[in-house]
């Protein structure tokens, strides 16, 4: 299956999950959730869930609820990341951000509800109960104190500081990398894959996440609003140190290339059919948006 075919299936599944009764569908909260969740995007995280499930010997269709769950979780993080108390951004995917359209209170609640729905979607799936539990545990770990929320906290309290590369990596491995690691490992868990598969999937996700963040930092300085669909230069305006600040453009390009090559090598330690994931890693390393 191609990346575009995966995206079409994921978008259709997300829309199906949010076919709500009329009494709920017209509420401001439901409209706020749908506004961000169904706004498009690359769908990288759910794609990773489905593909890792496939190459670990599972049925990707059975893992679709898990894939949708991680996209709900990711969408919640974007809504909250854009809030005035965080990055205070007004544009996301070429559209006004959630709080600009629906207000800060509704946007906050939309994110909260999407997080709850993510776990409910996993636990209501048709996967064997032990696989549901494993996926939920992986996702919870990726979001909590040692994961995405902990990374966002460090990002806020260290704002304006001169960060070392190690400190910057600590922020980004939690804030960005943890959810990508979770996507890969949840796919394996949904398939009932081995510990070796889980380990290799985690190493792939960590390298992919770091490369993704470095490329993001590059685009924040090199791209345009029209191309990215979100503000550029916001890191500099908020006095946040980035990989571009620490490594420069050449250093960033070199590091992204090294991480991408590592991510592809590590897959071969536990999986055979890795062509799609290798192509995805290559594509993300040179993405323009």
What is each residue range found by the language model?
Residues 22-267, 271, 275-285:
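Mg2+-dependent prenyl diphosphate-binding active-site environment of isoprenoid biosynthetic enzymes
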Residues 1-20:
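N-terminal amphipathic/basic leader segments beginning at the initiator methionine
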